[in-house]
From Swiss-Prot:
The reaction(s) this protein catalyses: tRNA(Ala) + L-alanine + ATP = L-alanyl-tRNA(Ala) + AMP + diphosphate
GO molecular function: alanine-tRNA ligase activity; aminoacyl-tRNA deacylase activity; ATP binding; tRNA binding; zinc ion binding
Task of the protein: Catalyzes the attachment of alanine to tRNA(Ala) in a two-step reaction: alanine is first activated by ATP to form Ala-AMP and then transferred to the acceptor end of tRNA(Ala). Also edits incorrectly charged Ser-tRNA(Ala) and Gly-tRNA(Ala) via its editing domain.
UniProt name for this protein: Alanine--tRNA ligase
EC code(s) of this entry: 6.1.1.7
Organism: Cereibacter sphaeroides (strain ATCC 17023 / DSM 158 / JCM 6121 / CCUG 31486 / LMG 2827 / NBRC 12203 / NCIMB 8253 / ATH 2.4.1.) (Rhodobacter sphaeroides)
Family annotation (CDD domains): AlaRS_core
The encoding gene: alaS
Cofactor(s) in the UniProt record: Zn(2+)
Key words of the record: Aminoacyl-tRNA synthetase, ATP-binding, Cytoplasm, Ligase, Metal-binding, Nucleotide-binding, Protein biosynthesis, RNA-binding, tRNA-binding, Zinc
Length: 883
């Protein structure tokens, strides 16, 4: 009995002998078709070959293509485990011709392989053809000798294939195996065709026409062939089984599940084992192809499949995670044919274990709630929609998981009630969002989010991807297209562009379609949508088009460096200043970073230098930057820093950097920086290059702000500083190494000169000013003098000199500084108990139009607007003294 691995090899070897290139399976995430969630047929990777957009160095190909059907219109999830032939993961064997051979070769190839290489009895086979395809019918008669009653003409679209509303299309012929009258069912096209007697095993599509938008159809210049045969189905047939799950490959996985759960593979838990075996394949291959569990897009479908399998493991009595323990059995069976499975084994096992560990507690709570709800219901009645919605909203149970759990109990869910509860929640969210102060056209984003769901972000793994234009918004309204010069917001099904959040600015780059090109100038996020702000620079961008999306690599790299440096800076500040340091805000732009943190005082130059040195030390260490997805509680248990006041969902992205013995953070207790973060980061710390702190300033009360540069920006800054240093050295005629001593000498020289100048000014003022002889008023000597151009800062020294001249008494000095007056008064210490300099200077200032004045009893100063009435000011001071 041939194994499935043998059957796969036989198929590929047959077509290799017949001039076909054996092409390896494409990934489950389509490279060139953004309209598909997953690769679901063999022709997906050849789509552009069929349409003429791509030309390869071969015209004949054969593949064993891995496929997933678990979302959209191709969704087999609900039936998996309960039927003989439904799978989420399957292999599609196919042969293809791109303008090379056609029906007269494709049909003989199929017949020869089935009847000779696979040794299927000819009398067990029959075929269908499109009702007008006389050519195919005649070839079947000639090649296989089939009578008319075993060539069934089908008038429906079951036998006419179309790539889409327009494009290549053509009739197809399907080959069926007859299990005999002991199995119920009728031939294709009959009322009993859904029975299991006649099973389709191979479909041959003849691409011979092109469908036009007006509905007309014309012959293709080059006719092509696309065939598909499910390996699991042909394997069951060749192994004499009526159930795909009884084939050798699936049976080995079922037995591995039974062994891991200590249960009978064919006992009461038979269905559970079948679900686990199927879902093990789809989850493992999806993870190997780069899909990780998340709450949106492909990651959400993966999570649904995982959780469905995990629920069935729970029903088998498993108390600990099971799925990851089955991966080695899968690798043994399929690793040789698909090396990516072997390469990704460690990641697959870790991801499955983490997801099952997190989901187990949620699952147990959810199932208890489900049992409680059922306990209050009459036997056989459906679960109310409100209860199903609570399971979904509170415990993360998708509706199909609840339906699956109830299916075993013979119950259903009130789906209409569930949808009503969902609609009510959306209405509340809409009302809340509309009243949150957003712009007047905010409702359109809510509508688009409801229609299209969240945008899937691909940017952690790539800077270039294919996407589909779901919507265009201009001036607050949807539009079908946008032409050159227009600015629009573009909604895509998936994107590599990062949307502004967490202090990191949005990406920029380019979007290209078959009809136009747009420059992406910013990306923001709203209601789970990524809003791509764009300017159409060429041609036209249309809704529904596929698009090539390219992020500005240099700009993204600079942003990554700044963001990763911010994490290092945060940790270095905590270590230098204390655990009270917490992030209060940040900006990670391409040209700089800014980090706000809780701290009450300015940092000293020595502290800043130490922080900068520590950051650069870790940059030079070139340690790996790693990210993991986990629950917020698990992240905090590992010591991860969270943003103050931020609300987190049921899973977070944790970024770790650097190694520091005894840090107490991370799984090994030796992680330097560990933070919750959804931003993009460098792969290794050395990619940051360099970090230069520009300075520390106050942001608000109790919050300091550090600004810094990294990478090329930091290098450019240092080069500019060096240039300035060189220019200063040249101006001072000194070597750069001598500058500090040279500047110190200049400062000291300047200080001495300033002192000399001040002394000369005082001497000039005292010698050249309008002076009066000291007079005696009320028994006290009084000396007044008017000078020119003496600044207020030099006047206290002159007052001291005047007091020395009188010995005992009071003095007044008035300086004309460009029409304005600076005044100073002094009283010798022996008289301050009788007379105050403050009183004297205020009286003099008022006479010159000034107000106020202050100081000490022995020395006071004031200012006034008019120095021309100096004599009046002197008389006013004399009057105060009693003169």
């Amino acid at each position: 009995m041939p194994s499935l691995n043998d059957i796969r090899s036989t198929f590929l070897d047959y077509f290799r002998r017949n001039g076909h290139r054996v092409v390896e399976s494409s990934p489950l995430v389509p490279r060139n078709d953004p309209t598909l969630m997953f690769t679901n047929s063999g022709m997906v990777q050849f789509k552009n070959c069929f349409t003429g957009l791509e030309h390869r160095d071969y015209t004949r190909a054969t593949t064993a293509q891995k496929c997933v059907r678990a979302g959209g219109k191709h969704n087999d999830l609900d039936n998996v485990g309960y039927t003989a032939r439904h799978h989420t993961f399957f292999e599609m064997l196919g042969n293809f011709s791109f303008g090379d051979y056609f029906k007269s070769d494709a049909i003989p190839f199929a017949w020869e392989l089935l009847t000779k290489d696979f040794d299927i009895p000819k009398e067990k086979l029959l075929v269908t053809v499109y009702h007008t395809d006389d050519e195919a019918a005649e070839i079947w008669k000639k090649v296989a000798g089939l009578p008319d009653e075993r060539i069934i003409r089908i008038p429906t679209n079951d036998n006419f294939w179309m790539m889409g509303p327009t494009g290549p299309c053509g009739p197809c012929t399907e080959i069926f195996f007859d299990h005999g009258p002991s199995i119920w069912g009728g031939p294709p096209g009959s009322a009993d065709e859904d029975g299991d007697r006649f099973i389709e095993i191979w479909n041959l599509v003849f691409m011979q026409n092109e469908q036009h938008p007006d509905g007309s159809m014309t012959p293709l210049p080059k006719q092509s062939i696309d065939t598909g045969m499910g390996l699991e189905r042909i394997g069951a047939l060749l192994q004499g089984k009526h159930d795909n799950y009884d084939t050798d490959l699936m049976r080995s996985l079922i037995e591995a599940s039974a062994h891991a759960t200590s249960t009978d593979p064919d006992g009461p838990g038979k269905t559970h084992h079948r679900v686990i075996a199927d879902h093990l394949r789809s989850t493992s291959f999806l993870i190997a192809d780069g899909v990780m569990p998340s709450n949106e897009g492909r990651g959400y479908v993966l999570r649904r499949i995982m959780r469905r399998a995990m629920r069935h493991a729970h029903l088998l009595g498993a108390q600990d995670p099971v799925m990851h323990r089955l991966v080695p059995a899968l690798v043994r069976q399929m690793g040789a044919a698909y090396p990516e499975l072997t390469r990704g084994q460690a990641l697959i096992e870790e991801t499955l274990k983490l997801e099952e560990t997190r989901f187990r507690q949620t699952l147990e709570r959810g199932l208890r709630l489900l049992e409680d709800e059922l306990g209050h219901l009459p036997e056989g009645s459906p679960l109310p929609g409100e209860a199903a919605f609570k399971l979904y909203d509170t415990y993360g149970f998708p509706l199909d998981l609840t339906q699956d759990a109830l299916r075993e109990k013979g119950r259903k869910v009130d789906v209409e009630g569930f949808e009503a509860a969902m609609a009510e929640q959306k209405a509340k969210a809409r009302a809340s969002w509309s009243g949150s102060g957003e712009t007047k056209d905010a409702a359109i984003w809510f509508d688009l989010a409801e229609t299209h769901g969240a945008t899937e972000f691909l940017g952690y793994d790539t800077e270039q991807a294919e996407g589909q234009v779901l919507a265009l918004v201009a001036a607050g309204a949807e539009t079908a297209s946008a032409g050159a010069g227009q600015t629009v917001q573009i909604i895509l099904n998936q994107t590599p562009f990062y949307a502004e959040s967490g202090g990191q600015v949005g990406d920029t780059g380019e979007l290209r379609t078959d009809t136009g090109r747009a420059r992406i100038t910013d990306v923001k996020k709203g209601q789970g949508l990524f809003l791509h702000f764009a300017e159409v620079v060429e041609g036209e961008i249309r809704q529904g088009q596929g698009a090539t999306l390219v992020v500005d690599h240099a700009r993204r790299s600079a942003i990554r460096a700044n963001h990763s440096a911010t994490h290092l800076l945060h940790e270095a500040l905590r270590r230098a200043l204390g655990d009270h340091v917490a992030q209060r805000g940040s900006l990670n732009a391409p040209d700089r970073l800014r980090f706000d943190f809780s701290h009450s005082r300015a940092l000293s130059p020595e502290e800043l230098a130490a922080v900068e040195a520590e950051v650069n030390g870790f940059i030079r260490s070139n340690g790996a930057v790693e990210t993991r997805i986990m629950s917020p509680d698990d992240a905090r248990a590992l010591g991860a820093q969270a943003l103050f006041g931020e609300k987190y969902g049921d899973e977070v992205r944790v970024v770790s950097m650097g190694t520091l013995a005894g840090s107490g953070k991370g799984t090994d207790g030796q992680t330097y920086s560990l933070e919750l973060c959804g931003g993009t980061h460098v792969s290794r710390l050395g990619d940051i290059g360099l970090c230069v702190i520009l300075g520390d300033s106050a942001s608000s009360a109790g919050v300091r702000r550090i600004e810094a540069l990294t990478g090329e920006g930091a290098l450019a800054y240092l080069n500019e500083q060096m240039k300035r240093l060189t220019d200063v050295a040249a101006a001072l005629k000194a070597a750069p190494a001598e500058l500090v001593d040279r500047v110190k000498a200049l400062v000291e020289e300047r200080r001495q000169l300033q002192n000399e100048v001040a002394q000369l000014r005082r001497e000039a003022a005292m010698g050249g000013g309008a002076a009066s002889e000291a007079k005696e008023i009320g028994g006290v000597k009084f000396l007044a003098q008017v000078v020119q151009g003496v600044p207020g800062k030099d006047m206290p020294g002159l007052i001291d000199e005047m007091k020395a001249r009188v010995g005992s008494g009071a003095v007044l000095l008035i300086s004309d500084t460009g029409g304005k007056a600076a005044l100073a008064a002094g009283v010798t210490p022996d008289l301050t108990d009788r007379l105050s300099a403050v009183t004297l200077v205020k009286a003099a200032a008022e006479a010159l139009g000034g107000r106020g004045g202050g100081g000490r009893p022995d020395m006071a100063q004031a200012g006034a607007a008019d120095a021309s009435q100096a004599d009046a000011a002197i008389r006013a001071a004399e009057a105060v003294m009693g003169g």
